[in-house]
From Swiss-Prot:
It comes from Mycolicibacterium vanbaalenii (strain DSM 7251 / JCM 13017 / BCRC 16820 / KCTC 9966 / NRRL B-24157 / PYR-1). Pathway: Cofactor biosynthesis; biotin biosynthesis. Pfam families: Aminotran_1_2. This is 8-amino-7-oxononanoate synthase. Its cofactor is pyridoxal 5'-phosphate. Its EC number is 2.3.1.47.
């Protein structure tokens, strides 16, 4: 007979003890005011979260439309600002249409679930973001997870399927390692087998492609009729929110069926206004995208990472969680905040420092980064 605990939450103490012993306990830390420490951990790739035009864009929207959207976009949460931003962003990346969600996470949930469902096949890369993993789980489709960037495995899954409809999902730039998906090969496989390709450009927008238009633009797939792009407004555009971009028929279908769009409060006007202003800055200053890659290459060199980064992300693999955590703490003690990725975010034995480059890093900040990272990581 199973012993029933009288305390329904008693098991939490046990699993917390296990996480602590494994070096996997997480804490929520407050972020100091801007300038108090050097930030090499955030996803503010273009340095726009503090840009005066971006802040003004958020404040102007706040004063015009109020603090919140006040409801679902299908009720009271839609404004002219939302729709104008969608039009400009779609034109920028070469898509026919766009639909703003409250976050990149909900954009992925909405797109994947609404475009798959029972009786369809979902093929997902093993390293896709957690939001895509959760979307696959919620879809009620049959899910096949393929080895990382293994196009042959994707094609095999598509070729042997019994389902009429199939969807392949991938990041364009993978968040932990910063490596790129083989988008041309994936699209070729999808087109051959009549599958839809959904690409999350969260880490590609603003960094890859012509003037930051994303990796899809770079490989010549922008606006493809059998492809859907998702992205976030919380990284290169320095705000928050998410977007699904693609054919107009997809937008119409999501408005009718995507539960995170229908039942969630619309993205706050201030966030839309800030993202809109950030997009205008990127359009006016396309050099920012290359600056990110240049700084990432410098950070990789400082950390003895031999492979030239393909994105803003530089991963310094240290092995065990305790080692990575101690190195991150040592950097912070010296005034530099870096990311620390441990399982389950990354596989066991690959805990790492995750550095992110920003277009706005100054020469003095890069000098500080060099000094601190050299002190902490040498010898390894």
């Amino acid at each position: 007979m199973t012993r029933v605990s009288l305390s329904p939450l008693a098991w939490l103490d046990e699993v917390e003890t296990q996480r602590r012993a494994a070096g996997l306990r997480r804490t929520v830390r407050t972020r100091p005011p801007v300038g108090a420490e050097l930030d090499l951990a955030s996803n503010d790739y273009l340095g726009l979260s503090q840009h005066p035009r971006v802040i003004d864009g958020g404040v102007s929207a706040l004063r015009t439309w109020g603090a919140g959207s006040t409801g679902s976009r299908l009720v009271t949460g839609n404004t002219e600002l939302h729709e104008a931003f969608e039009d400009v962003l779609a034109a920028f990346v070469g898509a026919e249409s766009a639909l703003v969600f409250s976050s990149g996470y909900t954009a992925n949930l909405g797109a994947v679930v609404a475009l798959s469902g029972p009786g369809s096949l979902l093929v997902s890369d093993a390293n896709t973001h957690a939001s895509l993993v959760d979307a696959c789980r919620l879809s009620r489709a049959r899910v096949v997870v393929t080895p990382h960037n293994d196009t042959a495995a994707v094609e095999q899954a598509l070729a042997t399927r019994s389902e009429a409809r199939a969807v392949v999902v991938t990041d364009s730039v993978f968040s932990a390692d910063g490596d790129l998906a083989p988008l041309r090969a994936l699209h070729t496989a999808c087109r051959k087998h009549g599958a839809l390709l959904i690409v999350d450009e969260a880490h590609g927008l603003g960094v890859r492609g012509d003037g930051g238009r994303g990796l899809l633009d770079e490989v010549g797939l922008a606006g493809a009729p059998d492809l859907v792009m998702t992205t976030t407004l919380s990284k290169a555009l320095g705000s928050q929110g998410g977007v699904v971009l693609g054919p107009a028929a997809v937008r119409a279908h999501l408005i009718d069926t995507a539960r995170p769009f229908i039942f969630d409060t619309g993205l706050a006007p201030a966030a839309v206004g800030a993202a809109f202003a950030a997009l205008q800055v990127l359009i006016d200053e396309p050099w920012r995208a290359q600056r990110v890659l240049d700084h990432a290459a410098t950070l990789a060199s400082i950390c003895d990472v031999t492979e030239v980064p393909s994105s803003a992300v530089v991963s310094v693999i240290l092995g065990e969680p305790e080692v990575a955590f101690a190195a991150a703490a040592a950097c912070l003690d010296r005034g530099v905040r870096v990311g620390c990725f441990r399982p389950p975010t990354v596989p066991a034995g690959t805990s790492r420092l995750r550095l992110t480059a920003r277009a706005s890093l100054s020469e003095d900040e890069m000098t500080l980064a060099r000094r601190v990272l050299t002190e902490v990581l040498s010898p390894r």
